[in-house]
Curated annotation (Swiss-Prot):
Signal peptide: none annotated. One of its GO terms (biological process) is arginyl-tRNA aminoacylation. This is Arginine--tRNA ligase. NCBIfam families: argS (TIGR00456). It comes from Xylella fastidiosa (strain 9a5c). Monomer.
Length: 562
C-alpha cells in the first residue's frame, strides 16, 4: 500500500516544480513512507518535506503544507495532517483496506510476492556441514534460516540457487577415517590405542558396522559399496564420508530442506582450482613470500593483518579453498551471493573478501554477503540439554525433530534474529496452547478451515463475490484492525528480504494471528444475515490465505485441524 502513496507524493513534488515553488532541478529525495508506531499518527507518515527543506532551504512545516495542497485527490485518503517538524501523516479510508483484502483473494498464493529481484541470479549457501557427524542444532538453525531466505528471495523475484558446500577435505576428515577404522578393529573410546582427536559418538560404531557388513549407500548418482578392508583408509574415507552425507541428506529431507547444488571441497583440489586461484593471486601482485610461506597482502583490502595462504610445508590454510569456492560462484554467474554461517566463522570473512578483491576481476566489495547466526541452547524441564548419545557430545537436529515436530523445530529456529542467541524450549515447542507461537499461528489457520466446514455443515452457502462486495458492512474496529494487519504482509515480505531477516515473517504471522483471534472472539461469524456472513467469511478467508503464504515462506505446514 506504500507504492500508491509514494507515487502520489512524487506527483505533488512535480506539481511544485512546475509552478516554480521548487527548483526545476529538485529531484524527489529518497524519502520514507512508513507506518507510524500508533495509528493516532495516521496509517502512513513521510519525511519528504523535511528532506526537501534541506535541499531548498525552506521551512519544513510550511513546505509540508504546500506539498499537501499540491497532492492529487485520492479516494483512499480520509485526511492529512502535518505533525512535529514537518512529518506528513496520512489517514486512510477503510475502503483502501477493504480493497487490499479483496486483492488477497484475487492474487491467492501470489499475494505478497513482487518482482524487485528482476529474475537476477542469487546463490544462497547454507548448512555446509562437515561430513564428520550428524547435523547438530546449529546446523538446524542454519538450515531453517537459509531455506527461509531462499524462499524470501524467490518471493521477491530472484532466481535462487540453493547450495550446500561439503567440507570433505582436511584434518577433520582424517580424524573421521581413523575413528571408523579404530571401531572396525574393535576399539572403543577409552581404550589404550583409541586415536587422539577421534570422534566418540555412537554413529562411528554404526558406520564401522555397516562398513564391515559390506553395506551399500545409495547416493543420487551412484551406489557406494564397502570393501570391508579395515586397512584400506581410502576405501574407509570414501564409505564414511558418503555414509554421513546420506545421513545428513536424510535429516534435511525430514526438515523439508533441499538444495540445487551439492559442492565438494575436495573437487577444488581434484580439478586444480585451488592452485589456479593461488596463481591468479600471485599474478595480481598481491602476494609475497616470507619465512618459506606464501602470504596474501590482505591488509590492502581491509583485513587487520596479512594472511598466510600456503604454509612452509606446502599445505594451504583453510581460507584459500574458500576463496577458490567463491570464485567458482562468481564464474557461474551469481550476480549476488549470500552465505549463511555460524558466528564462529566471523574471523574468516575479511580474508575471503580480501582474497576476492585481490583477484581484480570485477567482483564488487562486500560480495558475498554473509548472514551469521548465533548459538542455540536447548532446554527441557528448565535445564539445558547438552548431550546426545548418538552424537557423543551435542544435541542433533534429528533429536529436536523427533521430540517436537518439523514445523515446531523450523519455527523456533527461525523465530529470533539470526545474530541473537536462541533458546529452544522443547517443552514449549510441544505444547498445544497459545503460549506456543507455532501452535497459535497454525490454530488461526485451522480456525478459518473450521468456520468454512461449519458453514457447509449448516448449509450456509458462502458467496465470495457477495462477500467481497460487502466488506464495507464490517465497520467495527476489530474488523478494520484485522484488515490493516493483513495489508502489512507485502511490506514485511519485502523488508525481510532486504534485511535478510526471516524472523520478521514469524513475528508478523504471530501479530496477524493475534488480530484474527481477537476478531474471532469479538465477532460472531456465522450470523443469519447472509450479506454480513459472506463479508465476515471473506475476511476470514483472506486471513487464512495470508497465513498460508507466510507459513510457506517459513517452510511450516498449514494443518486444517488442530
Amino acid at each position: 500500500m506504500k507504492a500508491p502513496l509514494r507515487a502520489l507524493i512524487c506527483q505533488g513534488i512535480e506539481a511544485l516544480r512546475s509552478n516554480g515553488t521548487l527548483p526545476t532541478n529538485t529531484l524527489p529525495p529518497d524519502f520514507v513512507v512508513e507506518r507510524p508506531k500508533t495509528r493516532k499518527h495516521g496509517d502512513f507518515a513521510t519525511n519528504v518535506a523535511m528532506l526537501l527543506s534541506k535541499a531548498t532551504g525552506s521551512n519544513p512545516r510550511l513546505l509540508a503544507q504546500t506539498l499537501v495542497a499540491a497532492l492529487p485527490t485520492s479516494a483512499d485518503i480520509a485526511r492529512i495532517e502535518i505533525a512535529g517538524p514537518g512529518f506528513i501523516n496520512f489517514h486512510l479510508h477503510p475502503v483502501a483496506y477493504q480493497r487490499e483484502t479483496i486483492n488477497v483473494l484475487k492474487q491467492d498464493n501470489d499475494y505478497g510476492r513482487n518482482l524487485s529481484g528482476q529474475s537476477r541470479t542469487v546463490g544462497v549457501e547454507y548448512v555446509s556441514a562437515n561430513p564428520t557427524g550428524p547435523l547438530h542444532v546449529g546446523h538446524g538453525r542454519a538450515a531453517a534460516i537459509g531455506d527461509c531466505l531462499a524462499r524470501l528471495l524467490e518471493a521477491n523475484g530472484w532466481n535462487v540457487k540453493r547450495e550446500f558446500y561439503y567440507n570433505d577435505a582436511g584434518v577433520q576428515i582424517e580424524n573421521l577415517v581413523r575413528s571408523v577404522q579404530a571401531r572396525a578393529r574393535g576399539l572403543k573410546p577409552g581404550d589404550a590405542f583409541w586415536p587422539t582427536d577421534a570422534y566418540n559418538g555412537e554413529y562411528i560404531a554404526d558406520i564401522a558396522k555397516a562398513y564391515l557388513a559390506g553395506d551399500s549407500i545409495n547416493m543420487v548418482d551412484t551406489i557406494i559399496t564397502s570393501t570391508k578392508n579395515v586397512d584400506d583408509t581410502a576405501a574407509i574415507h570414501h564409505f564414511a564420508v558418503n555414509y554421513l552425507r546420506n545421513e545428513q541428506n536424510h535429516d534435511l529431507a525430514a526438515f523439508n530442506v533441499d538444495f540445487d547444488i551439492y559442492f565438494l571441497e575436495s573437487s577444488l583440489y581434484k580439478d586444480g582450482k585451488v592452485e589456479e586461484t593461488v596463481q591468479k593471486l600471485i599474478n595480481s601482485g598481491h602476494t609475497y613470500e616470507e619465512g618459506g610461506a606464501l602470504w596474501l597482502k590482505s591488509t590492502h583490502f581491509g583485513d587487520d593483518k596479512d594472511r598466510v595462504m600456503r604454509k612452509s610445508d606446502g599445505s594451504y590454510t583453510y581460507f584459500v579453498p574458500d576463496i577458490a569456492y567463491h570464485l567458482s560462484k562468481w564464474q557461474r554467474g551469481y550476480e549476488r551471493a549470500i552465505t549463511e554461517l555460524g558466528a564462529d566463522h566471523h574471523g574468516s570473512l575479511a580474508r575471503v573478501h580480501a582474497g576476492l578483491q585481490a583477484l581484480e576481476i570485477g567482483i564488487p566489495p562486500g560480495w558475498p554477503e554473509y548472514v551469521l547466526h548465533q548459538m542455540v541452547t536447548v532446554m527441557r524441564g528448565g535445564e539445558e540439554v547438552k548431550l546426545s548419545k548418538r552424537s557423543g557430545g551435542y544435541v542433533t537436529l534429528r533429536d529436536l525433530i523427533e521430540e517436537t515436530s518439523t514445523d515446531a523445530t523450523r519455527w523456533f529456529l527461525i523465530a529470533r534474529k539470526p545474530d541473537s542467541q536462541l533458546t529452544f524450549d522443547i517443552d514449549l515447542a510441544r505444547q498445544k496452547s497459545n503460549d506456543n507461537p507455532v501452535f497459535y499461528v497454525q490454530y488461526a489457520y485451522a480456525r478459518v478451515c473450521s468456520l468454512m466446514h461449519q458453514a457447509h455443515e449448516k448449509n450456509l452457502n458462502y458467496d465470495q463475490t457477495s462477500g467481497m462486495a460487502s466488506l464495507d458492512q464490517l465497520s467495527d474496529n476489530t474488523s478494520l484492525c484485522l484488515m490493516i494487519e493483513i495489508s502489512r504482509y507485502p511490506e514485511i515480505v519485502q523488508i525481510a528480504c532486504e534485511l535478510l531477516e526471516p524472523h520478521l515473517i514469524a513475528q508478523y504471522l504471530r501479530e496477524l494471528a493475534h488480530a484474527f483471534h481477537t476478531w474471532y472472539h469479538n465477532t460472531p461469524v456465522l450470523v443469519e444475515n447472509a450479506v454480513e456472513r459472506n463479508a465476515k467469511l471473506t475476511l476470514a478467508c483472506a486471513t487464512r490465505q495470508v497465513l498460508a503464504n507466510g507459513l510457506n515462506l517459513l517452510g511450516v505446514g498449514t494443518p486444517e485441524k488442530m
